[in-house]
Amino acid sequence: MAQPGPAPQPDVSLQQRVAELEKINAEFLRAQQQLEQEFNQKRAKFKELYLAKEEDLKRQNAVLQAAQDDLGHLRTQLWEAQAEMENIKAIATVSENTKQEAIDEVKRQWREEVASLQAIMKETVRDYEHQFHLRLEQERAQWAQYRESAEREIADLRRRLSEGQEEENLENEMKKAQEDAEKLRSVVMPMEKEIAALKDKLTEAEDKIKELEASKVKELNHYLEAEKSCRTDLEMYVAVLNTQKSVLQEDAEKLRKELHEVCHLLEQERQQHNQLKHTWQKANDQFLESQRLLMRDMQRMEIVLTSEQLRQVEELKKKDQEEDEQQRVNKRKDNKKTDTEEEVKIPVVCALTQEESSTPLSNEEEHLDSTHGSVHSLDADLMLPSGDPFSKSDNDMFKDGLRRAQSTDSLGTSSSLQSKALGYNYKAKSAGNLDESDFGPLVGADSVSENFDTVSLGSLQMPSGFMLTKDQERAIKAMTPEQEETASLLSSVTQGMESAYVSPSGYRLVSETEWNLLQKEVHNAGNKLGRRCDMCSNYEKQLQGIQIQEAETRDQVKKLQLMLRQANDQLEKTMKEKQELEDFLKQSAEDSSHQISALVLRAQASEVLLEELQQSFSQAKRDVQEQMAVLMQSREQVSEELVRLQKDNDSLQGKHSLHVSLQLAEDFILPDTVEVLRELVLKYRENIVHVRTAADHMEEKLKAEILFLKEQIQAEQCLKENLEETLQLEIENCKEEIASISSLKAELERIKVEKGQLESTLREKSQQLESLQEMKVNLEEQLKKETAAKATVEQLMFEEKNKAQRLQTELDVSEQVQRDFVKLSQTLQVQLERIRQADSLERIRAILNDTKLTDINQLPET
């Protein structure tokens, strides 16, 4: 009866729980609707963004396509411009050749004409000098005869005078004087005629010289004009050469970049090669460890064998030797051609080293034969002939190593191992033209592994350049736990055998089956020992491939260096041609500039002289004008001073008369007393003294000024006369100089006009060149802009793709969240339905306990 009482409480709690779940479900539904709305909005926004980005990408692609079309058009224009430049270059070369030929022809004609004219002038001058000297000699002889006759006549006259015949002497003297006058006329008249003729010839010669100089100047002017006309072509050719130089420099830069890339690849190959060397060294250590273990096992088996078993082993060895010899002969016949080719490739130094290495091998093995007679039959096949030092195959080498391992002496064959290893090392060097130091201890270790034929690895002598590391020596010399166990077992067995009965020689200590099994194991061990591991062969193949790649890389580097050298040679050749052309252009320009500069200097000198004369004339004129102005000013001052003095005098006279009249007009009252009169007299006297001193001072001052002005006027008058005379002379000189300079001015104006024309043509050509360069720079800038725009478009596309991927991931996440909400709402609806259908509280509790809302992944699928 007590149970029905509390039953309504679970119902109330259950109803509350249901109400809460319904509220939660309603909230979830509202959240779901809100999320669906947000998702639809975001989806619409994403769609709009996607469409907008697609339109932007299409527009950018259209812009990029247009830019590429423009770039192609610009490239075609650039190619056309380059073709035009090539044509201009050809035209320039042809014009240069024709111009040079014409210049040489003109120079040759001018030199011939000048030489002929100089010869004619020299001949005429020489003839004139000879005739003149002859006439002078004749005249001297005539005058000497005339002087002698005159002296004789004078002596005769003196004698006659002494005799007193004065009248007759006078008549005779008159007659003789007339005769002398006639003789003088007869001599002087032809002389005057000859002098006039010589003057005429001299004027004609001077006229010819002037004509020749004028023709020479005309030819030089013509040559100068031709040089000026060709200068533009030369400048165009120089511009073409500059463009070629820039193109060649760009090619050289490209080749340098390619060479740098090849060097970088070569460095990467070297790093890979070093890594391969490291792995090879590890494999080599592993192989040496296995070899050491096999050798220890061989030694232990050899200790166990009896003398009969050793004899049988010797017989088997002899059979193997015969088979090996037969195989060796067959291989020698088959590989004869390849061996001859290899011997041709191997250097002489390698052959000498192989012969030297074979000699100590034979000596060492003879020493072994003399010391250890029991193993003579085993060591006899190791003496290699000097003509075929590399004829053994790898299998033969490992068989020999097996036989060496079965001998009693472990120290006798280290020199043979060294010589074989050296021989293989030299062969490797000759094959790849590489030094052993390029590969380190790896190649030496490989040669040792291929030619291993000794027992004691502790006494092993490696080839030059190879040294075992401490870890390798420790790994070779150390014993494994299994080896220690076998060594202890063998030591116990040998001690038991020493204490036990020793069987006579020829009897076996083991059975036949055990012996056969032992022989098989030995044979298998020998085969395993002679067979190379797959890892080593793979490493060797990789090493060969790397060597081939390195050789190809070196060949490529050599080719690139050759191409770079050819490009540099071509660049130097073009630079040399350009330098020669520039030198010729400079020489021609210097010649023309020298001629122009000479004329310009003359014109400048005349202009300077004219300017100096004008300046001196203007300076003298200014000085005279200044002096005249000073004189006029001083004159005006003197006249003003004179007027002022006259006015002062007049004013003083007027003032005096005025004062007198005033005094007379005033009612002058005489003093009454003597004292007052005395004071008045003293006062007047003082005033009179003051007036007199002032008048004296003024008079002296005026006299001094008048004298100074008179002297100044006289000096200025003299200076004026001197200046007028000097200025008159300078004016006359200036007129003469102006008359001489006017012609030079006209010539200078003509030269300036020609120079201006040349400068204008040069300026036009330079402007054309600058326009072409600007066009080239604009094209390059446009190309750079287009490439930059392309890069930016690609970057933008990449960013848009990333953005689209990010939006896609967000969309996927939102879809997953929506699915989770849907899943959760469905689960809650199912649970509510199950709760509604539940018939008891325990069932509801079980349903609620089974429901786990901590993880969405744990919800069951509905």
UniProtKB/Swiss-Prot annotation:
<feature type="coiled-coil region">
    <location>
        <begin position="11"/>
        <end position="345"/>
    </location>
</feature>
<keyword id="KW-0968">Cytoplasmic vesicle</keyword>
<keyword id="KW-0813">Transport</keyword>
<keyword id="KW-0653">Protein transport</keyword>
<feature type="modified residue" description="Phosphoserine">
    <location>
        <position position="407"/>
    </location>
</feature>
<protein>
    <recommendedName>
        <fullName>Rab GTPase-binding effector protein 1</fullName>
    </recommendedName>
</protein>
<dbReference type="GO" id="GO:0042803">
    <property type="term" value="F:protein homodimerization activity"/>
</dbReference>
<dbReference type="Pfam" id="PF09311">
    <property type="entry name" value="Rab5-bind"/>
</dbReference>
<keyword id="KW-0963">Cytoplasm</keyword>
<keyword id="KW-0254">Endocytosis</keyword>
<dbReference type="GO" id="GO:0098978">
    <property type="term" value="C:glutamatergic synapse"/>
</dbReference>
<comment type="similarity">
    <text>Belongs to the rabaptin family.</text>
</comment>
<feature type="region of interest" description="Disordered">
    <location>
        <begin position="315"/>
        <end position="374"/>
    </location>
</feature>
<dbReference type="GO" id="GO:0008083">
    <property type="term" value="F:growth factor activity"/>
</dbReference>
<feature type="modified residue" description="N6-acetyllysine">
    <location>
        <position position="282"/>
    </location>
</feature>
<dbReference type="GO" id="GO:0006915">
    <property type="term" value="P:apoptotic process"/>
</dbReference>
<keyword id="KW-0007">Acetylation</keyword>
<dbReference type="GO" id="GO:0005829">
    <property type="term" value="C:cytosol"/>
</dbReference>
<dbReference type="GO" id="GO:0006897">
    <property type="term" value="P:endocytosis"/>
</dbReference>
<dbReference type="InterPro" id="IPR015390">
    <property type="entry name" value="Rabaptin_Rab5-bd_dom"/>
</dbReference>
<dbReference type="InterPro" id="IPR018514">
    <property type="entry name" value="Rabaptin_coiled-coil"/>
</dbReference>
<dbReference type="GO" id="GO:0015031">
    <property type="term" value="P:protein transport"/>
</dbReference>
<feature type="modified residue" description="Phosphoserine">
    <location>
        <position position="410"/>
    </location>
</feature>
<dbReference type="GO" id="GO:0019904">
    <property type="term" value="F:protein domain specific binding"/>
</dbReference>
<comment type="subunit">
    <text>Heterodimer with RABGEF1. The heterodimer binds RAB4A and RAB5A that have been activated by GTP-binding. Interacts with TSC2. Interacts with GGA1 (via GAE domain), GGA2 (via GAE domain) and GGA3 (via GAE domain). Interacts with AP1G1 (via GAE domain). Interacts with AP1G2 (via GAE domain). Interacts with ECPAS. Interacts with KCNH1. Interacts with PKD1 (via C-terminal domain) and GGA1; the interactions recruit PKD1:PKD2 complex to GGA1 and ARL3 at trans-Golgi network. Interacts with KCNH1.</text>
</comment>
<dbReference type="GO" id="GO:0006893">
    <property type="term" value="P:Golgi to plasma membrane transport"/>
</dbReference>
<keyword id="KW-0175">Coiled coil</keyword>
<dbReference type="GO" id="GO:0005768">
    <property type="term" value="C:endosome"/>
</dbReference>
<dbReference type="GO" id="GO:0005769">
    <property type="term" value="C:early endosome"/>
</dbReference>
<feature type="modified residue" description="Phosphoserine">
    <location>
        <position position="374"/>
    </location>
</feature>
<dbReference type="GO" id="GO:0032991">
    <property type="term" value="C:protein-containing complex"/>
</dbReference>
<dbReference type="GO" id="GO:1903441">
    <property type="term" value="P:protein localization to ciliary membrane"/>
</dbReference>
<keyword id="KW-0967">Endosome</keyword>
<dbReference type="GO" id="GO:0099149">
    <property type="term" value="P:regulation of postsynaptic neurotransmitter receptor internalization"/>
</dbReference>
<feature type="coiled-coil region">
    <location>
        <begin position="534"/>
        <end position="816"/>
    </location>
</feature>
<feature type="modified residue" description="Phosphothreonine">
    <location>
        <position position="408"/>
    </location>
</feature>
<keyword id="KW-0053">Apoptosis</keyword>
<dbReference type="GO" id="GO:0016192">
    <property type="term" value="P:vesicle-mediated transport"/>
</dbReference>
<dbReference type="InterPro" id="IPR003914">
    <property type="entry name" value="Rabaptin"/>
</dbReference>
<dbReference type="GO" id="GO:0030139">
    <property type="term" value="C:endocytic vesicle"/>
</dbReference>
<feature type="modified residue" description="Phosphoserine">
    <location>
        <position position="377"/>
    </location>
</feature>
<comment type="function">
    <text>Rab effector protein acting as linker between gamma-adaptin, RAB4A and RAB5A. Involved in endocytic membrane fusion and membrane trafficking of recycling endosomes. Involved in KCNH1 channels trafficking to and from the cell membrane. Stimulates RABGEF1 mediated nucleotide exchange on RAB5A. Mediates the traffic of PKD1:PKD2 complex from the endoplasmic reticulum through the Golgi to the cilium.</text>
</comment>
